[in-house]
Amino acid sequence: MMIEAYFSAIVFDPCPTCPPGLKHPLTLQGRIGVIADSHGNIASMTDCIQRLTDRRADTIIHLGDIFDSEIHHNLMNIVDVITDNNILAVKGNNDYQIEKSLENGHPMDLDPSDRQRIRQFLHSLALYFTSGNVCFAHSRPFDSIRAFYEPIDTGSTEQAARIFRHTDHHLLFCGHSHLPMLFRWRAGIVTREPIPEQTPLVFQKNEKYIIIVGSADKGECGFIDREKMVYERIRL
């Protein structure tokens, strides 16, 4: 699909209760594991962490929807898994809904100390962060609530094309949509492509990419080698 000129402005509402994207880029080198959309499934999340640890990932990043807004048990255990394994994370829409429920006094059968710790954990999550020309977000890499609610993959390349036009990221890794998918910008053309399980994706300097990792709840995660500039889809 050829990218056409977009004349309408994209306006994102402010998100006063959410930390925006981190303004100081992180320094992430070497091997990076990525997980998304575990939706409260501790078993799947820990399986992904173990698989990425076995691959000697230097850093593991969770791309949001750590929790599920309809599943309220094991919230503290989920926080412990993230913090005990030094997982970096961004906020997803389900995480935001849990945060707002706690702020609004929903009991969720939690001890007061656990409630406070979960709230602090959720409030600390940024909407996205960058490392060099690489960005990590739940969905769209912008400072608004809409950004983590609206999917990039709508079955077409329209939303991906807008992100390529409005950002300078070489690579964007995200979740929200549960099916692994690649959007590629090459010489003004955006394509939507499935991500194969067995063939590593080699990144080219003259292209830009959006990688939707897929849902850990459905057995998906990914592995990035920044030195070799490759991405591998991992299916549990």
What do the predicted segments below correspond to?
Residues 65, 177, 181, 215:
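Divalent metal-dependent hydrolysis catalytic cores, especially in the metallo-beta-lactamase
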Residues 26-29, 190, 194-236:
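Binuclear metal-dependent phosphoesterase catalytic core
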Residues 5-6, 161:
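Non-catalytic terminal accessory segments
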Residues 30-39, 133-140, 210-214:
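Active-site-proximal beta-strand elements of phosphoester/diester hydrolases
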Residues 73-74, 79-173, 177-187:
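Conserved catalytic scaffold of divalent metal-dependent phosphoesterases
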